[in-house]
């Protein structure tokens, strides 16, 4: 069956968008709240009608992720900001493989995310309460699966508990996109042998996104 590179590119952009958020938060303590909302909201949509539905049915919501994906695919440097983004992206992919191999962890993840629905009746998605709950799911279910993702940034910024929670919540969103990517036929070999196809798709989607 032919791969749907449009959907695969969307999910990859979702992973890269999470990596971008982690980098921004770790270095500055801040990020674009609209971008963060798209990523965190993707965690809650476990039965989407389509890949794009995971991200609010709007390609524009993944603009940052698509730009980040192009940066990763077009760089050969192993230093600096681009290397950080690549490391976060590939670390998320590696962690998802460990998650997929453990049915108990997958079940627990689904259960914990389901429990958030009650809290969301009373709190906004970007509230400290919900962000902390998402971070706790990452710590309890994902970070126990293997070597922890080493987040690099400003030591002062990373001491802030609210920043830590947002970073972990963004990493959980990255895992969500990685699960989706695998479900729709994504695989590591594509990142080596199908780069031109992924770059073409990402550029075509970005061309449809209005400039702000």
Swiss-Prot record:
Q: Which GO terms describe its cellular component?
A: cytoplasm; plasma membrane
Please give the positions of the paired cysteines in each disulfide bond. Answer: none
Q: Where is this chain primarily localised? A: cytoplasm
Q: Which InterPro entries match?
A: HflD (IPR007451), HflD-like_sf (IPR035932)
> For this UniProt entry, which segments traverse the membrane?
none
Which keywords has UniProt assigned to this entry? Cell inner membrane, Cell membrane, Coiled coil, Cytoplasm, Membrane
Coiled-coil intervals: 92-128
Record's signal peptide: none
Q: Where in the cell is it found?
A: Cytoplasm; Cell inner membrane
Q: How does it sit in the membrane?
A: Peripheral membrane protein
Which Gene3D superfamilies does the entry mention? HflD-like
Similarity annotation: Belongs to the HflD family.
This chain's protein is named High frequency lysogenization protein HflD homolog
| Organism from which the protein derives | Pectobacterium atrosepticum (strain SCRI 1043 / ATCC BAA-672)
Q: What is the lineage of its organism?
A: Bacteria, Pseudomonadati, Pseudomonadota, Gammaproteobacteria, Enterobacterales
Encoding gene, per UniProt annotation: hflD
């Amino acid at each position: 069956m032919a791969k749907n590179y449009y959907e695969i590119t969307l999910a990859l952009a979702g992973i890269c968008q999470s990596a971008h958020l982690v980098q921004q938060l770790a270095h500055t303590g801040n990020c674009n709240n609209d971008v963060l909302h798209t990523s965190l909201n993707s965690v809650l949509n476990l039965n989407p009608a389509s890949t794009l539905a995971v991200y609010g049915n709007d390609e524009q919501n993944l603009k940052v992720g698509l730009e980040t994906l192009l940066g990763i695919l077009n760089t050969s440097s192993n230093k600096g900001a681009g290397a950080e983004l690549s490391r976060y992206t590939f670390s998320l992919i590696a962690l998802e493989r460990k998650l997929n191999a453990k049915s108990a962890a997958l079940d627990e993840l689904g259960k914990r995310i389901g429990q958030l629905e009650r809290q969301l009746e009373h709190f906004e998605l970007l509230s400290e309460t919900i962000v902390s709950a998402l971070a706790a799911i990452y710590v309890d279910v994902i970070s126990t699966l293997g070597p922890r993702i080493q987040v690099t940034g400003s030591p002062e910024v990373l001491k802030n508990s609210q920043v830590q929670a947002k970073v972990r919540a963004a990493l959980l969103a990255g895992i969500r996109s990685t699960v989706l990517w695998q479900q729709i036929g994504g695989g590591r070999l594509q990142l080596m042998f199908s780069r031109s196809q992924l770059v073409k798709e990402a550029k075509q989607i970005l061309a449809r996104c209005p400039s702000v």
